[in-house]
Design a protein with these regions (language model features):
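Polar/charged low-complexity regulatory segments
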Residues: 2-43, 47-48, 52-243
Length: 243
């Protein structure tokens, strides 16, 4: 899930909160779909795996995504709308997209992912920017410490700096718009699933390795807000610069 600068600004001026959609489909069993039907975003992949989005990942719309974000992850209307509107550049003429459409490089998908290879990295001759990379994930966990420490803004800042250096070494580039997306993407799971400023390590493993939101996330009805996400992005940059 990604948030562009333009859609963030629009979201901040989205007043009112329409009533949270009531679920009419309770078949949210986790059934992992094939990678051929998935994109580089583990969050949207998880929503499809759990039935909040069509399980085949096809013919999605921003409205469907917004409803899924509000239903499954209890996002506020401004946050869900801002995230779903960021998908507009990959829509077909009929207003739909498929999850694999998100693989298009430097539109929404971008370099410096925590768990995916950069598109043009020397060790990525096939330009595979969507497959989960276990070694990258282990490096991410190691940034938080050698034991079972949780993921915090401080450890995320360490990950952010490390991935920036690795990407630059491999020739990766980010424009201002995608830099903003990358900052908020780095803290997005913390905003969605964190408690007490921390992500429990087991939860993080479930999310990235299985592409599934654990019950403790979907059953936590606290509202996730756009301002909360932006605040965490600012704090991340503070840690990057000063910590």
């Amino acid at each position: 899930m990604h948030l562009t600068l333009t859609n963030t600004i629009r979201g901040l001026f989205t007043f009112g909160s329409p009533k949270k959609p009531e679920s009419t489909d309770h078949s949210y069993e986790y059934i992992r779909g094939p990678i051929e039907e998935r994109g580089p975003c583990p969050g949207l992949n998880a929503l499809a795996n759990q039935g909040y989005l069509p399980r085949d990942g096809k013919n999605l719309t921003p409205a469907l995504v917004s409803t899924a974000l509000r239903t499954a992850l209890h996002m506020s209307h401004p946050l869900a709308t801002s995230l779903s509107n960021s998908l507009k550049p990959i829509l077909r003429k009929d207003g739909t997209f498929d999850l694999p459409s998100m693989r298009a490089h430097n539109i929404i998908e971008h370099d410096r992912s925590i768990t995916r290879l950069d598109y043009s990295a020397p060790n990525n001759p096939t330009h595979d920017n969507f497959t989960f990379q276990p070694a990258m994930f282990e490096a991410f966990l190691a940034d938080a410490g050698p034991g079972e420490e949780g993921i915090t803004l401080k450890s995320l800042a360490k990950t952010y700096v490390r991935r920036k250096k690795e990407s630059k070494k491999d020739g990766g580039k980010l424009g201002l718009g995608l830099w903003f997306v990358n900052v908020l993407q780095t803290v997005s799971l913390l905003n969605t699933a964190g408690k007490g400023g921390e992500l429990e390590r087991g939860l993080v493993k479930t999310f990235y390795e299985e592409e599934r939101f654990p019950d403790l996330v979907v059953e936590d009805e606290r509202t996730r807000t756009l301002l909360g996400l932006l605040g965490k992005g600012v704090l991340l940059l503070w840690h990057v610069v000063f910590a």
